[in-house]
Amino acid sequence: MEATPLSWFKTEPREGRTMVFDPLRRRWVALTPEEEVRQKTLYLLVEHLGVPAGRVAVEYSLKVNGQDKRADAVVFGGAGEPLMVVECKAATVALTDVVLDQAVRYHSVIQPRYLLLTNGTTFYCYKAEGQSLQPLDHLPTYAEMMTTDL
């Protein structure tokens, strides 16, 4: 049986604002500048990097220092192990050390192999090696994420 193709970037006006259909969450959400980047990043992960749609949790809830937080997305492996935490910012937001620190806090709780930061224009990807994060010069495919070495 062939999987139904996902419908990306479907928008419609509702109550004075633009909504976008998120095919992974299977619901309409407000199309904010950050949501636009999140949708484009999810599209990249699923359609170009080979991440199975069912292995992506969008707005993944976690606790950081006792506070409820949400990672924009977490990619999981076949056994449910976290492979990548994704943090998206609006295109107008610079990816500063403050943004990296936020993502690193999420990374320390979830402990995936990879960390991805993006504002839709710039992408920073890191691989966890022991207690440090090593910058990568490319975005890993799902197959690469599933292997222990790059």
Where are each of the predicted segments found?
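A short, conserved, highly charged catalytic patch centered on acidic carboxylates
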Residues: 1-114, 121-150
